[in-house]
């Protein structure tokens, strides 16, 4: 066969008979052929660019810093193949900053963009514009099913909720009062938390233990504003278990640690952040569920690299491992 035919098979192009294609694939497998990635990168250098759109890190939570750490690792690794990667930040409490970031992005040329879809409707519009410009998209952290062209890499939110329910079953007794707590400013933009809560409810309802479940929102980030809300909820509900649906579990733990006059509930929350681990080590938090945010950004870049440089298939759903940390094992854990 000709070199051109082999090239068409290697790059998954058309105009090759199925018999010839299979024969070439068998030879490739037999001789363990690997493409010369550095040579291939020369052909795409100066026109292969990826963008990342994520929230900037905040003082209240270092979650997005972990995600950025993984992205920076990917930038360091994949830039050697001639790939240009640029990160665009927005404030997850201000929709206009997302619009501004994506406008700057669209003023440049990119082959693909990694998106943390905090603002659902705005993200849908942005993805629609990307599609019109032939820019591939992939989501991290949370998903909007059916909208990204290259899939989703992040936690299975429903399963994390079910896991939290499973952990609650070890802490709560029949008829226990359970407070499901959403803590964040701009909670209307955290729709994905509802998926966690759905999984949590479903698991506990299947147990038929008559748990008393209450879902409450505290739409603040500052502890001085959160503290009186927690004080009110505690006296109103007297919870046996508190399930914090995001990474702000340290704020809740701080409240119960400082207010010795109130009865301390069991606490479950998310993410391997220093502030959370501090209270886990003190026994104020019973369980942390970790979703490896640092891996999400890195794997998304790796996915784009494999698609554009290795010519591998796309449309991937990559669910992150779900890790459980306790006071006894956190010291051995690495994100």
PLM feature segments, named:
Residues 56-63, 87-97, 154-162, 182-205, ...:
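Hinge/beta->alpha junction and helix N-cap segments in small-molecule ligand-binding domains
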Residues 36-96:
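Amphipathic helical "hinge" segments at domain boundaries
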Residues 112-131, 216-275:
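Hydrophobic alpha-helical
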Residues 152-178, 226-227, 292-309:
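Hydrophobic alpha-helical segments within soluble ligand-binding/sensing domains
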Residues 27, 31, 188-189, 204, ...:
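Hinge/cleft segment of the Venus flytrap/periplasmic-binding protein
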Residues 1-46:
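N-terminal helix-turn-helix DNA-binding module of bacterial transcription factors
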Residues 77-81, 133, 204-211, 258-263:
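Short helix-capping segments at alpha-helix termini
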Residues 122-159, 273-281:
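Flexible loop/hinge segments that line or gate small-molecule binding clefts
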């Amino acid at each position: 066969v000709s070199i051109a035919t082999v090239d068409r098979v290697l790059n998954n192009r058309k105009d090759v008979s199925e018999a010839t294609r299979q024969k070439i694939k068998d030879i490739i497998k037999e001789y363990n052929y690997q493409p010369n990635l550095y040579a291939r990168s020369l052909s795409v250098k100066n026109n292969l660019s990826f963008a990342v759109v994520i929230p900037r890190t905040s003082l209240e939570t270092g979650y997005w810093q972990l995600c950025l750490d993984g992205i920076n690792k990917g930038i360091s690794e994949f830039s050697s193949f001639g790939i240009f990667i640029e990160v665009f930040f927005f404030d997850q409490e201000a929709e206009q900053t997302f619009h501004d970031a994506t406008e700057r992005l669209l003023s440049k040329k990119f082959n693909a963009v990694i998106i943390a879809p905090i603002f659902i409707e705005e993200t849908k519009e942005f993805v629609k514009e990307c599609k019109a410009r032939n820019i591939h998209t992939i989501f991290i952290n949370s998903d909007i099913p059916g909208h990204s062209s290259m899939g989703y890499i992040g936690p299975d939110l429903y399963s994390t909720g079910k896991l939290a329910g499973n952990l609650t079953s070890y802490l709560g007794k029949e008829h226990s009062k359970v407070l499901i707590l959403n803590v964040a400013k701009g909670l209307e933009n955290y729709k994905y938390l509802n998926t966690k809560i759905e999984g949590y409810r479903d698991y506990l309802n299947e147990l038929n233990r008559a748990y008393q479940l209450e879902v409450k929102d505290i739409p603040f980030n500052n502890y001085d504003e959160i503290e009186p809300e927690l004080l009110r909820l505690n006296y109103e509900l007297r919870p046996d278990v508190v399930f914090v649906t995001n990474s702000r579990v340290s704020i809740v733990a701080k409240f119960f640690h400082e207010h010795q006059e109130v009865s301390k509930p069991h606490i479950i929350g998310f993410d391997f952040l220093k502030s959370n681990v501090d209270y886990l080590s003190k026994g104020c938090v019973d369980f942390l569920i970790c979703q490896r945010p640092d891996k999400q950004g890195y794997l998304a870049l790796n996915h784009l690299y494999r698609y554009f440089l290795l010519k591998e298939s796309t449309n991937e759903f990559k669910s992150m491992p779900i890790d459980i940390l306790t006071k006894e094992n956190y010291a051995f854990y690495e994100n």
